[in-house]
Structures are given as structure tokens and as C-alpha cells.
């Protein structure tokens, strides 16, 4: 896990049930394992009010969400690439985990993987993009010994 530097900011009232940094590194490493650069990612874990504010300011959506990704993708010095920031909402992730009957760890993994793929340029603005991203998320989750998060549709 030498090719990743993760900075974590804990910015919520209750830090209980947040995965350890080692887990975030393991999940992100699965995606970046073939990258030769040292990749830097900041993860900020927040409450609903902060993610709602960010979602409105950057996406004009006045509601909380589980994750926001802010890609940067610039070299800050030789072989050091600042990929960007992930802002994860602890409360939303916990609620979704219960709602969709997923283990909390698995859902944290999925949302982190989803956000990291956004940092790398993947998106889901249309059915084709969504299918590509969901297949990749399923493959990565299975490789980490979690269940597939998506049931894929045929278009």
C-alpha cells in the first residue's frame, strides 16, 4: 500500500462505527494497485448538515447525499499525484446500510470505491456510463470478498 497517502478528517459529532484508515487504504488500493504514482486522497467524514451544504453549493441539490467527490488529478511534485477529496456522510451511510440490509463495513467500502472511481473520471450520467461503473464496482467489491452492490440491468 505504498502508492497511496490518505488524509482523513473526522468532522462529525460521533465518530463511532467509522472504518479505520487501514480499511479505506485497502479499498482504495484495490482500484489504484496498477498506478505507478503515489496518489494522495483526502477523506472528510461529515454530518448531514455539512454534506447538504456542500451538495447545494457544488451541485445545486438541496439535500444530503452519501458521498461527494472532488477530483483534482494534478501532480504536485514528481510522482506525487493529488487525486482529490472524498466527502462521506456517516449518518447517510449508516441509514442506507440499514435500509438496504447491507453490512455497514460493506456499504462504507462500496461508497468509498464509488467515490474513488469518480476521482478517476468515471461517472453515471447515462445508462451506458452507469453500467460501466456498476460493473466495475461489482468486480472490485467481489475481489474484496464483499457481495455485489448492484444487480445489473440489460439495456
UniProtKB/Swiss-Prot annotation:
GO terms for molecular function: metalloendopeptidase activity; RNA endonuclease activity; zinc ion binding. Its main location: cytoplasm. Its EC number is 3.1.-.-. GO terms for cellular component: cytoplasm. GO terms for biological process: rRNA processing. It holds the Pfam family YbeY. PROSITE patterns: UPF0054. Keywords: Cytoplasm, Endonuclease, Hydrolase, Metal-binding, Nuclease, Ribosome biogenesis, rRNA processing, Zinc. Binds 1 zinc ion. It is found in: Cytoplasm. Signal peptide: none annotated. The keyword rRNA processing applies. Zn(2+) binds at residues 114, 118, 124. Its cofactor is Zn(2+). SUPFAM superfamilies: Metalloproteases ('zincins'), catalytic domain. The keyword Heme does not apply. It is an enzyme of class 3 (hydrolase). It comes from the Bacteria. Belongs to the endoribonuclease YbeY family. NCBIfam families: rRNA maturation RNase YbeY (TIGR00043). Single strand-specific metallo-endoribonuclease involved in late-stage 70S ribosome quality control and in maturation of the 3' terminus of the 16S rRNA. This is Endoribonuclease YbeY. It comes from Buchnera aphidicola subsp. Acyrthosiphon pisum (strain APS).
Amino acid at each position: 500500500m505504498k502508492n497511496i497517502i490518505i488524509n482523513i478528517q473526522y468532522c462529525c459529532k460521533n465518530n463511532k462505527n467509522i472504518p479505520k484508515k487501514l480499511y479505506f487504504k485497502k479499498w482504495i488500493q484495490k482500484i489504484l494497485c496498477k498506478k505507478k504514482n503515489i496518489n494522495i486522497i483526502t477523506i472528510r467524514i461529515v454530518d448531514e448538515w455539512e454534506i447538504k451544504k456542500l451538495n447545494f453549493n457544488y451541485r445545486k441539490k438541496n439535500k444530503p447525499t452519501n458521498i461527494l467527490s472532488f477530483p483534482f488529478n494534478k501532480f504536485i511534485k514528481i510522482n506525487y499525484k493529488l487525486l482529490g477529496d472524498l466527502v462521506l456522510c456517516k449518518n447517510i451511510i449508516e441509514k442506507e446500510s440499514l435500509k438496504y440490509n447491507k453490512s455497514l463495513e460493506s456499504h462504507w467500502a462500496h461508497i468509498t470505491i464509488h467515490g474513488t472511481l469518480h476521482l478517476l473520471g468515471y461517472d453515471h450520467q447515462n445508462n451506458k456510463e452507469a453500467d460501466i461503473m456498476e460493473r466495475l464496482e461489482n468486480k472490485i467489491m467481489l475481489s474484496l470478498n464483499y457481495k455485489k452492490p448492484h444487480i445489473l440491468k440489460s439495456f
